[in-house]
Amino acid sequence: MSAIVDIIGREILDSRGNPTVECDVLLESGTMGRAAVPSGASTGSREAIELRDGEAGRYNGKGVLKAVEHINTEISEAIMGLDASEQAFLDKTLLELDGTDNKSRLGANAMLAVSMAVAKAAAEEAGLPLYRYFGGSGAMQLPVPMMNIVNGGAHANNSLDIQEFMIVPVSQPTFREALRCGAEVFHALKKILSDRGMSTAVGDEGGFAPNFGSNDECLSTILQAIEKAGYRAGEDVLLALDCAASEFYHDGKYQLAGEGLQLSSAEFTDYLATLADKFPIVSIEDGMHEGDWDGWKLLTERLGKKVQLVGDDLFVTNTRILKEGIEKGIANSILIKINQIGTLTETFAAIEMAKRAGYTAVISHRSGETEDSTIADIAVGLNAGQIKTGSLSRSDRISKYNQLLRIEEDLGDIASYPGKSAFYNLR
């Protein structure tokens, strides 16, 4: 038995300089697991609640001392002595202790930090790398990365309404080569922007944040960078978007302020379809407002066979909402953010539900990150096939890519890189 003998919660800082929660879990054998939780900028209204102190004079109200106190008191008392290898039972204990539907009492940030730290301690106790502990002998597939090389929307202070413009390397034989491709395109784009006298400052997720005249101009420039780096757009490298449409949906219209457009759901579907026809776009995330299910249905019927349609704010890693979406034929993919739901057990359940329905599951970071690289191990352990963890800059993003390189090395000859086949939801 891997009994839990000590739990320590603490307040640390994330990549935006805001407080977040870190937790250490110590086992009877002396083994320790440490985990830190991320935080989002654009959030779904039905996400599990991240507990903040609200004390205006300290970190602008964003302190997490209440969540830390819950770890060091109530949660510690409830799980002390439990077997760390019994993840499902431990997470069930946390859920029952919280007692709310949205984890608002203890805080999803407190619960997730403990859930992750326990898993890490148990993996260490078992002498297994974390991805192997999660997935057993079947964990051998590296994920295709969606690399956010231009930031807009809530992630940057520029004129772009769409939040993320991503490159997706798909023709490479290994993850290592896919990562090299992404880095080379990133540097080619930096040179193009610099030559034009445009900003090469980066946003929250490490992508550039220049002022383009339109989304079309941004995508065209990315195609130039792909070519400049020596790759073929549409063959070696595909494109992906995160619209984060809930952020610019007001008064029943999709208001693209950067382009002076106010569009209905049908008109915005036409807008996205035009982009998908013009550019090699393989994936669009949150293409409609989270509450605009009629719009989502229209978008899915229009593009769902040729473009991966990812629900982030739509599904918030929640199996109850995902089940409803599957039944109604909404989207064909789910974004998986561990802090949207608050425990590893619930996270894994969402991934499995998606797969059973023929939906893909894209493992994702948040805009406020830490050096914790657990999502890399989840992506491989659960054979998710896709990961979204930022650009090719900022160590809070690179830490996940570097962990995937280590995992690929550890797997050796049995490692596989799915490329285009990661998009099995497209027919």
Curated annotation (Swiss-Prot):
It catalyses: (2R)-2-phosphoglycerate = phosphoenolpyruvate + H2O. The active site is at 205 (proton donor), 337 (proton acceptor). Mg(2+) binds at residues 242, 285, 312. Its main location: cytoplasm. (2R)-2-phosphoglycerate binds at residues 163, 337, 366-367, 388. One of its GO terms (biological process) is glycolytic process. Catalyzes the reversible conversion of 2-phosphoglycerate (2-PG) into phosphoenolpyruvate (PEP). It is essential for the degradation of carbohydrates via glycolysis. Belongs to the enolase family. This is Enolase. It comes from Burkholderia vietnamiensis (strain G4 / LMG 22486).
